[in-house]
Amino acid sequence: MERTYQYAWIIPFVPLLVTMLIGLELLLNPTATKNIRRIWAFPAVLLLSIVMVFSTKLAIQQINGSSIYEYLWSWSITSDFSLEFGYLIDPLTSIMSILITTVGIMVLIYSDNYMSHDRGYLRFFAYMSFFNTAMLGLVTSPNLIQIHIFWELVGMCSYLLIGFWFTRPIAANACQKAFVTNRVGDFGLLLGILGFYLITGSFEFQDLFEIFNDSIINNNEINSSFATLCAFLLFLGAVAKSAQFPLHVWLPDAMEGPTPISALIHAATMVAAGIFLVARLLPLFIAIPYIMNIISLIGVITVLLGATLALAQRDIKRSLAYSTMSQLGYMMLALGIGSYRAALFHLITHAYSKALLFLGSGSIIHSMEPIVGYSPAKSQNMVLMGGLTKYMPITKTTFFLGTLSLCGIPPLACFWSKDEILNDSWLYSPIFAIIAFYTAGLTAFYMFRMYLLTFEGHLRSHFQNYSGHTNSSFYSISIWGQEGSKPVSSNLLLTTRNNNDKSSFSNCSFSNTYKIAGYVRTMRSSFSTHFLNKDSHTLLYPHESDNTMLFPLLILAIFTLFVGCIGIHFGHEVMEVDILSKWLTPSMKLFHQNSTDEDWYKFLTNAFYSVSIAYFGIFLASVLYGSVYSDRQNLYLINSFAKIDSKMRIRLEQIINVIYNWSYNRGYIDVYYEKVFIKGVRELAQLAHSFDRRVIDGVTNGIGVASFFLGEGIKYIGGGRISSYLFLYLACVSIVLLIYYYYNFLN
């Protein structure tokens, strides 16, 4: 065991070899390297697999022995101060290492085919391997200084990967937005690190916890307000990195990068870094009740905000991004209420489910691009999808499993972890628990909305010219966006409404009917889009992805089905498969000290309510979006709403519009930041520029000009005649004497 731990330092550096070798080969022999570029996927996967096997061995030893191993070596700067570097192997490190490597391997295999035609293939794999190195270095860090170093490397890699297609202005702006937003959190993190060093005199976790808890808190040796401020600054770094309110605005824009990047960022790397940091520092935070309250409050706000912002999104990746934001809020809420085990459990289950969903969305986008075009506004638009079950059955099945898992449907992975958080939240605050339960229903609604719009009904790619640029309401805004498409004349009656040219949130439009050419059911023969080229008339339609893209989906689907088993707790008298509790053995177990059958009974009771809420959300999504273009019964359902009392109907429409506008416009938070912060900073910069140009430069330039004219004047006065000099001298002396005598006369 000791020998295994001694070689644990290689964990972060093994994937770095790929980045270094690719760079070296491109430098020495660029042409040959580019010609055989796809061969580099093999060493990238192989080296990360070695790290995965090594991490698994360490994890097994952690389960059996529950030991912590730390190795440090010092870099002395002065006799009074030295920096220590090394690695820390404990249950949290082993969990994160396995998570990063397993998801990373699946993403690398998937990317080989997904990025095969991209000119930046080699650059992509170099960035990805370096990203894995940075994240593995972060989770093995034994102190705050080393964490900060790798924390910044993670941020740099995310900047490079989000802006991978940097020639697209929208991608370039997105990576800058992510970078600047995270600067706010990183600045807070650095100040917090320095503040706690000032308090404790150490950067090491173990020393930090012991000194802070024993010597400082108990003896009141420092100002508690200062300690709270430093802890809040540390937490601010996690808020930015894990896209918590109010620093969440970068996350949906990060979808401008390639889809495999989105899967890695949202599942196991960047956004997980913030959760990891709070989990690592939880013994510190738990000694400051105010900080725990702030963490739980930020978490519950993010849970609800992320879910509401996902309701009306049309971009499939942005919908998943807001879903990630909401689920990260659940994890932060769990950490804030002290439920360490539940937070890490949900981090594990969510990582595999969300990686499955993102890679599934990449498969969908990959299939839609030849049909609707390569612009993300079309290929990622759920408006133009639908009916993909027929063409992509494997992708559909895996995506469906991921959707059910995220909805919290048993026995899939996220059910066990989410319900544990819901169960623990009741013990902390009933208000937080009610919000968390309500959000579980919203999660089921928007996830099934996404699934139904993508896979059910019929293919809608032929409506790509009606994607929301006109005023009338053909389809509901929940599908088409803020403005519907033009009504087309003829046979079919679809109900629409005219309310200042704004559409409703659901399929339930009420007044004014328009006839549309042909019943949509007759469009079955038009599933494909026809394109003309020089030689032939080619029929294009969606198709299933290649095996190298399907293989990771199937593996992640297996994880989604069974990874929840590691944390199921049945009680000792029934059955015990709770590997996670044996693995973690955390120092704080506020809710899992003595688990009994009564606890299991409470869990089942809460699970019944949460699953019922989830099924209600699924039912509501099915009513509003299920087979919307192929089932005639849906028309009767829509028209039945017209029988509602007019006042109630108007009130309902107003409520629906408010919800839609809030969701579609991202809660107006981006608009607020744009007007208050961005424009404010720009105006301040312009004011500073104007002051510098007119005042600072004016004074210096004025002195120079005055000196010039003074010199010119003196030059013309001096003509070389001694008599003129004597006259000037006597005149000056006379003036001085007159002033002197006049001053004495007055006194």
Swiss-Prot record:
Matches recorded under Pfam families: Proton_antipo_C, Proton_antipo_M, Proton_antipo_N
Parts of the chain that traverse the membrane: 8-28, 39-59, 89-109, 125-145, 147-167, 185-205, 231-251, 259-279, 281-301, 328-348, 355-375, 397-417, 426-446, 550-570, 608-628, 726-746
Record InterPro entries: NADH_UbQ_OxRdtase_chlpt_su5_C, NADHpl_OxRdtase_5_subgr, ND/Mrp_TM, NU5C-like, Proton_antipo_N
Subunit structure: NDH is composed of at least 16 different subunits, 5 of which are encoded in the nucleus.
Function description: NDH shuttles electrons from NAD(P)H:plastoquinone, via FMN and iron-sulfur (Fe-S) centers, to quinones in the photosynthetic chain and possibly in a chloroplast respiratory chain. The immediate electron acceptor for the enzyme in this species is believed to be plastoquinone. Couples the redox reaction to proton translocation, and thus conserves the redox energy in a proton gradient.
NCBIfam families: NDH_I_L, PRK06590.1
Name of the protein: NAD(P)H-quinone oxidoreductase subunit 5, chloroplastic
Organism listed in the record: Nymphaea alba
Lineage, top ranks: Eukaryota, Viridiplantae, Streptophyta, Embryophyta, Tracheophyta
Gene coding for it: ndhF
